């Protein structure tokens, strides 16, 4: 049970940090992704 809780906390924290950085600074790498 503890492993599951720690994994969830780790993933959620990384996700929040990733989205915060992504929305604060748009990626400067040119993407050829067409939407």
Curated annotation (Swiss-Prot):
It comes from Citrus sinensis (Sweet orange). The chain crosses the membrane at residues 3-23. It comes from the Eukaryota. This is Photosystem II reaction center protein T. It is a single-pass membrane protein. The gene is psbT. The keyword Transport does not apply. One of its GO terms (cellular component) is photosystem II reaction center. PSII is composed of 1 copy each of membrane proteins PsbA, PsbB, PsbC, PsbD, PsbE, PsbF, PsbH, PsbI, PsbJ, PsbK, PsbL, PsbM, PsbT, PsbY, PsbZ, Psb30/Ycf12, at least 3 peripheral proteins of the oxygen-evolving complex and a large number of cofactors. It forms dimeric complexes. Keywords: Chloroplast, Membrane, Photosynthesis, Photosystem II, Plastid, Thylakoid, Transmembrane, Transmembrane helix. The keyword Transmembrane helix applies. Belongs to the PsbT family. GO terms for biological process: photosynthesis. It is found in: Plastid, Chloroplast thylakoid membrane. Pfam families: PsbT. Found at the monomer-monomer interface of the photosystem II (PS II) dimer, plays a role in assembly and dimerization of PSII. PSII is a light-driven water plastoquinone oxidoreductase, using light energy to abstract electrons from H(2)O, generating a proton gradient subsequently used for ATP formation.
């Amino acid at each position: 049970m503890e492993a599951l809780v720690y994994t969830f906390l780790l993933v959620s924290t990384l996700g929040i940090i990733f989205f915060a950085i992504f929305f604060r600074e748009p990626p400067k790498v040119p993407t050829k992704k067409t939407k």
